[in-house]
Amino acid sequence: MLARQGRRLTREHRLLLALWARLLEPWQGGAVPFGAVLARAGQRPVEERVRLGSGWQRQLDGALENLAAALERDQPAAIVDDRRKCTLCSWHGLCGEEAARAGHLGDVSGIGGKRRQMLQDLGIDRLEQLAEQDPEDLARQLGEHGDQHRDVAPMLVQQARVQRRGQPRRLADGPALPELEDAAGVLLYDIESDPDRREDFLHGFLRLPRSPDGRWCPEAASYHPLLLRADLGEDRHWRRLEGFLDRYGTWPILHYGETEAIALQRLARRQGVPPAAEQALRARMIDVHARLRTHWLLPVPSYGLKSVAGWLDFRWRQAGVEGARALLWWRLWNDARAPAAGRRLLLRRILTYNQDDCRATWAVAAWLLQGAAQRAPDPAPTGGSTNPAVLESCSSTAGPEPAP
């Protein structure tokens, strides 16, 4: 029996069940044809039966043979292409360093396992080789696999060249965030979600006013978390959220990625917000990630917030924390049997992580506002940044805000 946290049953889940079934066979004196998976539908647990046929046993054989061969070698096995599932692994940082040192193609933004194989079939095995390619020739060759691969080829070459040089490259002229030129302030917005329950349990805002002389001063920012409590209901939660947004009705809402905009608009729609008000809310929302991708190429393996803000030397106060860990803390916090002191600590950690995500979003936005310095500055202490794009507009250096 396996407890599944995500929405879908993955190949890894099935292989693990197949392994357990094989280990149980001699103890039970017979084959184990099925596995059980427990998941959650709302507040109710549900069970799914999984057939463990011969096909999965063959795949398990192959996986075990590959593992045995890797353990016999003197050198470590090749780094996997997709390391997004490795964020909680203690080896994650070391693997990333090795991939960067070796020029692993999987470390070029836009290259997954399938596209990497296409490039290797063309004799392109490393970032250096990709950077040397003629964009038009590569587009023609990848075009045999479809228009999508042909169209992205020139950008892959440019991205590889930027990563090889270690310097950003501007793609589009003009300001990346013109909406902020006359804004009295901005709201930095980040949500934390539970995908199993399909709920956004925390809407976090960093309120950043502008000084009378037009400077942006992050040290004047204040954090406003709106926690979804099941006992209050979504309608009351929306009224609190709507009241906060209306208080700063002319301020742009900056977020990193499309998740926040989609979630907020869906919530407004479920609460019966008139179309005109929904359109006004949509017009206030600015996706910093989309603006960054339109205007710049960066020497980063990923354009996720952690990667980009880290390149700008922003540091989260809780090292190594990802959204998955914040979700785990949330689920533990919801356990009423947990000691009160432990629950307070969990909530504090969740809010600190969310606040730092908001602050990291501002670090990227501030870099864009400056027209972007041509390199990342020296490392900053945890929770802060020495990036001049973040602090240069204020007379004093902003240190880390206290945890909420």
Question: Positions of the model-derived regions?
Answer:
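C-terminal extensions
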Residues: H92-D213, Y223-R229, E234
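Acidic, Mg2+-coordinating catalytic module of metal-dependent nucleases/exonucleases
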Residues: R40, E47-A102, V308-A380
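Conserved DEDDh/DEDDy metal-dependent 3′-5′ exonuclease domain
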Residues: M1-A70, A220-L327
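Short, intrinsically disordered C-terminal tails of secreted or membrane-associated proteins
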Residues: P400-A403
